Amino acid sequence: MPSMNQKIFEMGFSVETVSVYLLCCSLADSDARISVKNLLGVWNATEDELNKGLNALEDRNILIRTVSDQEGNVFYRLAEFKDWV
């Protein structure tokens, strides 16, 4: 089942934050890990905009940070829709 939920378009996020969400869904749907490194590989705006989008999604419990390793790699997972705030 695809991970993208249409509700994301009704939550008042910036275009950049919605784009981050869609990229996260694309990675998840292709069984790739959602990580800053993987996102930067397909992100076409600034790293600062990516981080702002990630933070906004974390703040609303849409994206959950699962691991930050000693090498600075950060990994996420998508939360279930029922857990969004």
Tell me the role of every PLM-derived stretch.
Residues 23:
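Short active-site loop/helix that positions an aromatic residue
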Residues 10-15, 26-77:
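Winged helix-turn-helix DNA-binding recognition segment
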Residues 1-20:
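Short alpha-helical segments that sit at the start of domains
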Residues 80-85:
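Short, amphipathic alpha-helical interaction segments positioned at domain boundaries
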